[in-house]
Amino acid sequence: MNNSNRSAWLIVITGLIVACLCFATAGAGLTYLALQAAAQSDVASRPSSLPSSGRTTSAPVVAPTVARTPVAGNSTINSTYQDLVNAVLPREDLADIAVRFKGVPASEAQFSCPTLSKGYEVGATRTFTLSNQDDNSQFVATARLEYKTPHAYMWVQTEPERVRLNLNRLRQAANDFENKIYPTTRAFFGEEESPGVDCDVHVHVLHVTGVGRTVGGYFSSVDGYPNEVRSDSNEGQMFIMHAERGYNGSDPGSESYMSTLAHEFQHMISFNQTHAPSLWLEEGAAQLAERLNGYAETVTSVYDFAANPDTQLNTWGEGTAGGNSAHYGGGYLFWSYLYDRFGEDIVRKLARSPERSPQAFIKVLADSGVTNSETAKPFTFEEIFSDFAVANYVGRQSIEAGSNRFNYATIDVPPMSTRNSLNNGDYPYNVREAVPQFGTHYYELKGSKPVSVTFAGSTVVPLLPAQNSDGAFWWSNRADQSNSRLTREIDLTRVNSATLNFRTWFRMEEDYDYAYVSVSEDGGVTWKTLETPDCTTDNPQNANLGCGYNGSSGGDTPQWIDQQVDITPYAGKKFLLRFETITDAGVNREGFAIDNISIPEINFTDTGNSDAGWKSEGWTRVENTLPQSWTVQAILTGSDGKITVQRMTMKDNTGTLPIDLGGNVRSAVLAVSPTTQVTTVPGAYDLQIR
């Protein structure tokens, strides 16, 4: 197998600081940050009567404005929204990028293995290039091969300092990986690339120090490429285990050590098996791998999600591992819910599908003949999420006989935090709130008299938090492992000088994801980045291909900024002009937007209102407005103790729901969730309970 159509991954798993029984944090970047086992929370599993959790979720995300702009069913924003939801972006391909931007011959960017290598024998030594996540630096370490199995090498650092491990436990851990984790994880998720770039079937497990205070271990897909593509590649399929005392790698055979191997091996398989543009699904799958290998007790991030159920499920934060713990928990719970509701075979199909995304899962269900019994139509992601939001509160209590639609069957879920707990003296209750998309606000309602719930939610939501957008503009879209391109031929054969003008708004993951303006004079075979007023040549992670846009336009809070680029060196020529974004697998931000493109000398102007001769690969012409959708549902505990679910019927995102408290209903839990994909701007709503 060659390494075409593959992207760069660096998956970091944070270490457990045992002394304080707490999660340390790790810097974001070209990273997957995965939390380790910690002391179990003192929050018990939800008992049978659905009592108050006794906790409330965090303060409002923003000072909200409830936008009530009418949205016609056939409006442009609805059709644009569907285009964005269904978009499949080109995959980041480091081999192709090396050919295009670095001039690497195509034959050297690929690899093949006509024969297997002889591999390494115990006692061999070699050097490795490693990353320190504390300061985003790289360093070189030397290691000795201490043990090997048919599919694993166990390397231990000898320089710059010697790592001392219990070699008997190391050998046993290697055998457990060989005999348990390796076959179990492959049976469910698929296979890693084997042999790899080194033409060796072994996975390299390297035990080192100096990779960062909060890093327990990581997998970097860069190591799967030839050095001609990435000079920092170790040219082998490998995991890094932080072996400093107190970290995962220092205690071979422990649950935290073995669960880390299971977690990272899933990432390695996924890199070969599927395109993973959604980090929350990728990390959820890695934690599912821990569970499938018998290490469910190490998945403690569910407690952080339970404390923050308003966490947006379908995104990831650019921050520390601790700050993203709730995202880990949400992703793991979603995979577990799918597993319990739809079964192992369907979830295995999702894990192995060519694209690991919400739309891919909907397709897996449809292809398997699974439909929504209420509509007799294929499921939507929003419908599944609505049921998931109920299951998170209900836990393992069965609501529908013979179905796990509203509950979990195989795991215990901590009680979800509530936004407020209300009783007789709290009514009438009025609140205006904002909640992240695909997050949930829970309100617990009790009382001796019936109440009426009135809801009014925003009908529209911004695509980007971009102020002063001038009508339509081009947007790169956003995803992990992506490479969106917008290309057009420019003819300057009749002019002696020329200037490229455009406005841009961008927010790209700091130091790892970049946007470029580039030109090709050979029909697109090779490309050169243009120097623009706000691009940077800084390259801390070997990811910048020249002069790229990174971070936020105009300061910490992105602003639209004007750009002017002298393209006189291309006067008298025809060439290809391209706007391009390249993102890694770790985190993605809102992306790259451009508007008011012009080259006055040839009377070219593009205000984003037409395709204007551009070839789009992943880019979409948009206006900065999306339709906002909502799910409002009540989990009712009847006077007989039976639990039912009732959904509010809404028109233009407004509706009323009567609840017979003090009569047929003993207590109720109101669950409010905005369900607009693509955006990370929260939805705002007004709630009245009288």
Each PLM stretch: what is its role?
Residues 498-506, 575-582, 608, 670:
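Extracellular beta-strand-rich recognition modules
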Residues 357-485, 503, 511-518, 587-592, ...:
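Beta/coil-rich, acidic/histidine-enriched accessory regions frequently appended to metallopeptidases
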Residues 64-161:
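Acidic/polar low-complexity interaction segments
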Residues 4-19:
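N-terminal Sec-pathway targeting helices
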Residues 226-234, 255, 259, 274-341, ...:
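Acidic/His/Gly-enriched intrinsically disordered linker/tail segments
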Residues 20-23, 38-69:
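Ser/Thr-rich, Proline-interspersed low-complexity disordered segments
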Residues 518-574, 622-631, 637-654:
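Exoplasmic/lumenal beta-rich domain surfaces
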